[in-house]
Amino acid sequence: MMKPHNLFQFLAVCSLTVAVASAQAGAVDALKQFNNDADGISGSFTQTVQSKKKTQTAHGTFKILRPGLFKWEYTLPYRQTIVGDGQTVWLYDVDLAQVTKSSQDQAIGGSPAAILSNKTALESSYTLKEDGSSNGIDYVRATPKRNNAGYQYIRIGFKGGNLAAMQLKDSFGNQTSISFGGLNTNPQLSRGAFKFTPPKGVDVLSN
């Protein structure tokens, strides 16, 4: 399992790129267009984290409402919920009966994930280019312009005009891959869906 801080940043970056990327054709122009048009998205995901020592796979669902709101719920092999409500990022580990909360600005404000709340920052924060095809999936590579972003690049893949996959390679060479399913690019979401109240009896820690 990722450490909470890394998980916060990764999921926030994912929230950005999913919201930006899941429109139609897998072209850079589609990314730019959807960045201007998209406000919300929901669906399911399978996440695989590959390091030199081991591979970890997890499954769950997600929802995003721009600006700045996201919720990722892991269901297998562990139960964990990560909610960004615009001010606080909450990580609830069901099995540990523990909640960790962090300032959203501190948790993700120093990363390109901050452009969740700024639709104009896509091109200023990333260099975008077509990145070939594999297994019928067309990829766009988004390389952060900041040297200290914490990851090397994000690859966003489309199949049949729909978002199919995303890959993120960090500065240590570890790769996180996500495949998406059941996408709804026009979900009926309210800000209330991203409010989180720690359940009674759990330990609440602050970062």
Curated annotation (Swiss-Prot):
Q: Which UniProt keywords apply?
A: Chaperone, Periplasm, Protein transport, Signal, Transport
Determine the domain of life of the protein's source: Bacteria
Note the Pfam families from the entry: LolA
Q: Which Gene3D superfamilies match?
A: Lipoprotein localisation LolA/LolB/LppX
| Biological process annotations from GO | lipoprotein localization to outer membrane; lipoprotein transport
The intrachain disulfides are none
Listed InterPro entries: LolA/LolB/LppX, OM_lipoprot_carrier_LolA-like, OM_lipoprot_carrier_LolA_Pbac
What's the main place this protein lives? periplasm
Q: Where does the record say this protein resides?
A: Periplasm
GO CC terms, sorted: periplasmic space
Signal peptide positions on this chain: 1-23
Q: Identify its protein family.
A: Belongs to the LolA family.
Q: How does it assemble?
A: Monomer.
| Protein task | Participates in the translocation of lipoproteins from the inner membrane to the outer membrane. Only forms a complex with a lipoprotein if the residue after the N-terminal Cys is not an aspartate (The Asp acts as a targeting signal to indicate that the lipoprotein should stay in the inner membrane).
User: What's the protein name?
Assistant: Outer-membrane lipoprotein carrier protein
Designated gene of the protein: lolA
